[in-house]
Amino acid sequence: MMNASTKFSDNYDVKEELGKGAFSVVRRCVHKTTGLEFAAKIINTKKLSARDFQKLEREARICRKLQHPNIVRLHDSIQEESFHYLVFDLVTGGELFEDIVAREFYSEADASHCIQQILESIAYCHSNGIVHRDLKPENLLLASKAKGAAVKLADFGLAIEVNDSEAWHGFAGTPGYLSPEVLKKDPYSKPVDIWACGVILYILLVGYPPFWDEDQHRLYAQIKAGAYDYPSPEWDTVTPEAKSLIDSMLTVNPKKRITADQALKVPWICNRERVASAIHRQDTVDCLKKFNARRKLKAAISAVKMVTRMSGVLRTSDSTGSVASNGSTTHDASQVAGTSSQPTSPAAEVYPNVLLFNPQKFPRNCVHPFTTHPYYSPKESSKKKLFFTLLFEVCPHTSRSHILLRDNTKNIYHPYHCFTNKMSNYERAAPSSHGSSTTKKIANAIADLVIRRSSPSIRRKTEADVHNSNRNRKVSAPANLQHALVPVIDVVVATGALASSSVDNLSASTSSDLGRNLLNKKEQGPPSTIKESSESSQTIDDNDSEKGGGQLKHENTVVRADGATGIVSSSNSSTASKSSSTNLSAQKQDIVRVTQTLLDAISCKDFETYTRLCDTSMTCFEPEALGNLIEGIEFHRFYFDGNRKNQVHTTMLNPNVHIIGEDAACVAYVKLTQFLDRNGEAHTRQSQESRVWSKKQGRWVCVHVHRSTQPSTNTTVSEF
């Protein structure tokens, strides 16, 4: 798109927010000249590291190359001083999987049409040297709400550029959709996308994935072995041609795996009217509803964790925690979030800051409790402490669910029925008359948010109930309350969807219990029982590297952990153990990340970053020192000051981290250095390296390095 000005605000009018991430926000925008609507991804580049910024540039570069009817198109990319604007197609149809469950009719032939469009987009990407690497339901959208709208492939944040002579190393993708070669840390290329297509096609046909386990190690073992099957009765009605296509996509050996172009020529796809079954698959739709609900629940929980970590909305007015009327404890927000206490704003003193996941014990019919952080109400009593519990409750007699909101004095507010057509006497509990006006106002605001964040059908049904009850619904939530509560209300809505889909005893079962129930699918339940790893929605992008022929270039990568987790255990000892394990894992990840940053600085000849990450008295044993122990970093300045023009790419393979106490760590790894010599010839060099890190003044610095390899010559590159 050609614009007279390179300034975003000169070309576009910004409208409402469509979505939000840690460092970006997506807003609807209108082009001032044409009046066309787009979706603008606005990235705050001040918050990005150098590695993140290179990832952003790579994504924009790839998206500019791709113009296909089944790919969300990038129309404009504008870089300003503090923000980068990516202007995409405005895709209004929502997720493909959500649309399927709303259809009145869905057959194997429909699944064939869906996967055909996905394969068309992948074939186009591969023909242009692009590997997506993150194919999953969340990235499959519909162009509009119209019937028969095109499927659009989105999110090229993990995509890479390759050619037929290149292969990549690096752990990137989403666990449930990762290919065996990625998990085995073998070189990989375009076939990884076909494997993910096979997983998606399997889900499209029966509503659950081929590989599942609550334990991620066992999940990975299943994938590496290609251990999946076609259980009865749901697979009995699927044609052999569909199963054959899945088998060709889920072939463990990537060299024998079918390509996108070959898959498009399979009769089940190109002649679906003759080959694919046209029988309605109600069991698949029912199962897919539950699959979607679990995905949304995990995504919402991840959003809550992201809010508590990144947004800074958690504020506390009570550092010691408070005891609720039922005897349970609501912990201090800074303790729950793992952050320091923040001063409260005037608005935060009147309204609850954020809903926190709380594993308190509630009645058996409670699906999930979410409790607001305590706050003081200055208008009524400086000593009066209030907080709410927002939960879904399932009637034991009717199995119907509804939203229930109660405060710490056991007053009940707005038990709006959201998932059935009628409200039973059990569900029509009237609000207590003892609640204060401030409390009722907040209850109204929270209930408003729940209604607006629910699906349109739920919203209409709920608003009708409100109208019939002659309740006053003019109170709306203030902006700061909406910003803080929306992610958690999404969790509650997703939880309610699970309850309405008859996922029994979710509150009473631990994640492992649920996993065992799902694994015993054939014996215990109908084909609508879902199966999915608790980690399958977590996206990973770790230590990418390019290997092979062609021009070598320095590529930075970033570890992205969305942190989706299962249900929190109420056992203190279990929670402490999990917390300790999580902290240790996070520390190890930090060491790997800072080591990769140091290697990147060496490759880029960035002496400023190098000195920031190394202690001034760092010692080293390395071939360049001819066996001598060198102290200080000045010895290495020569390699930065030299006028080296070689293009260098460094990869850290198989890092092994040992945490030593609280302030020290050691990492050992194999370093692969790829470069072009002065004649343009490619070389690869391998060495074994270990680094000792020490935490000083809250940051990690390298205090010792030991490397084993042959000394550098004029045809190679120093690897210090």
Curated annotation (Swiss-Prot):
UniProt-annotated location(s): Cytoplasm; Cell projection, Axon; Perikaryon
Major site of localization recorded for this protein: cytoplasm
Catalyzed chemical reaction(s): L-seryl-[protein] + ATP = O-phospho-L-seryl-[protein] + ADP + H(+); L-threonyl-[protein] + ATP = O-phospho-L-threonyl-[protein] + ADP + H(+)
Chain residues that bind ATP: 18-26, 41
Gene Ontology biological-process entries: MAPK cascade; medium-term memory; positive regulation of gene expression; regulation of neuronal synaptic plasticity; regulation of protein localization to plasma membrane; serotonin biosynthetic process
Protein kinase domain location: 12-269
Effect annotated for changing residue 100 to K: Loss of cooperative activation of adjacent holoenzyme subunits
Modified residues (Phosphothreonine): 284
Classification via InterPro entries: Ca/CaM-dep_prot_kinase-assoc, Kinase-like_dom_sf, NTF2-like_dom_sf, Prot_kinase_dom, Protein_kinase_ATP_BS, Ser/Thr_kinase_AS
Cofactor(s) recorded in Swiss-Prot or TrEMBL: Mg(2+)
Assembly description: Dodecamer. Subunits are tightly packed around a central ring-shaped scaffold with extensive contacts between the regulatory segment of one kinase and the catalytic domain of another enabling cooperative activation of a subunit by the adjacent molecule. Interacts with and phosphorylates daf-16; the interaction promotes daf-16 nuclear localization. Interacts with egl-2 and tir-1. Interacts with nsy-1.
Name of this chain's protein: Calcium/calmodulin-dependent protein kinase type II
Source species of the chain: Caenorhabditis elegans
Taxon lineage: Eukaryota, Metazoa, Ecdysozoa, Nematoda, Chromadorea
